Design a protein with these regions (language model features):
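Extracytoplasmic
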Residues: 35-90, 175
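Hydrophobic transmembrane alpha-helices of multi-pass secondary transporters
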Residues: 32-48, 79, 109, 113, ...
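Helix-boundary and loop/linker segments of multi-pass membrane transporters
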Residues: 25-33, 116-119, 218, 247
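Transmembrane alpha-helical core residues of multi-pass small-molecule transporters
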Residues: 43, 59, 79, 109, ...
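Cytosolic juxtamembrane N-terminal segment immediately preceding the first transmembrane helix
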Residues: 1-49, 63
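Hydrophobic transmembrane-helix bundles of small-molecule transporters
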Residues: 184-275
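Residue-level hotspots within pore-lining transmembrane alpha-helices
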Residues: 46-50, 116, 120, 132, ...
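Helix-loop-helix hairpins in multi-pass membrane proteins, especially solute transporters
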Residues: 87-224
Length: 275
């Protein structure tokens, strides 16, 4: 004799098993997205942290390479200028290439720049290393935000965007403190040395974890707008970053750069509206 309620119980268990099986792809996709966002966020944290770490090291670098303060300041100014020029192109890059490809390029550039910076025999080599780092940093920040907007479910999107904002705001704030400790104990090259294994691990994890399914497009690339944006943001950033030389030495270059930047920005805006 069949025990009471055995039939309905078996049917209920079968329905629950089917429901769990149906939900499995969704759970797998959520875990995949969490891994992608996690790797991108941690990479962005390290790369944005790098933006401010050398400020404390400038006096030591000046002594090591026997350069003036105005030359050493280019380690910061060059970084900002590169980001100002590269960031406007990321809209095109994100449409043209997959998330995985851009991650490999961005973190790969930063990894190479960090290695070269740690071994830099001259100031020029160190400056080039900083520019390479900046190019990677300029790509990873928009990539993190775009991936969040396109991949995360709407009900979680606000939370993830908030966490991304924490990454962007906290990293540059703690950079000088951490670099001060490292430089005092190990020297300025250790700033690059400590970042190198961390970013290398993130690079390897990202190559394995990031798998993208979205289709890429071949959007038209407006060369004129790119040139205008480079002059606009590059000129404005250089003008503001060099304001000290204007005040202390009466240099005219910052004023010219700033005016050219503003003019290029106005032309850029008019062109974008008319397209």
């Amino acid at each position: 004799m069949t025990p009471p309620h055995e039939g309905p119980t078996a049917e209920l268990e079968e329905e629950l098993a089917l429901a769990a099986k149906a939900d499995e792809p969704e759970r797998v996709e959520k875990r995949r997205i969490a891994k992608v966002i996690g790797v991108l966020a941690l990479s962005a944290f390290v790369m944005i942290l790098n933006e401010t770490v050398l400020g404390v090291a400038l006096p030591v670098i000046m002594d090591d390479f026997a350069i003036a303060a105005s030359s050493a300041q280019w380690l910061t100014t060059g970084f900002l200028l590169t980001m100002a020029v590269v960031i406007p192109t990321t809209g095109f890059l994100i449409q043209r290439f997959t998330t995985r490809t851009l991650f490999v390029v961005a973190v790969g550039l930063f990894l190479v720049g960090t290695l070269v910076g740690a071994l830099a025999p001259t100031f020029i080599v160190l400056l080039v290393a900083r520019i390479v780092q900046a190019a990677g940093t300029a790509i990873i920040m928009p990539l993190l935000m775009t991936t969040t907007l396109t991949s995360v479910a709407p009900r979680y999107r606000g939370t993830v965007m908030g966490l991304n904002s924490v990454v962007i705001s906290v990293a540059p704030a703690i950079g000088p403190t951490l670099s001060g400790i490292v430089i005092h104990s190990f020297g300025w090259r250790a700033v690059f040395g400590f970042m190198l294994p961390v970013i290398a691990i993130l690079f390897l994890v990202g190559v394995v974890a990031i798998r993208t399914n979205h289709e890429t497009r071949r959007p038209s690339f407006d060369v004129a707008s790119m040139i205008l944006s480079a002059f606009a943001f590059g000129g404005i950033v250089y003008g503001l970053a060099s304001i000290e030389s204007l005040i202390t030495h009466g240099a005219w270059q910052p004023i010219v750069a700033f005016v050219v930047g503003i003019a290029a920005l106005l032309v850029f805006i008019v062109r974008q509206v008319s397209l």
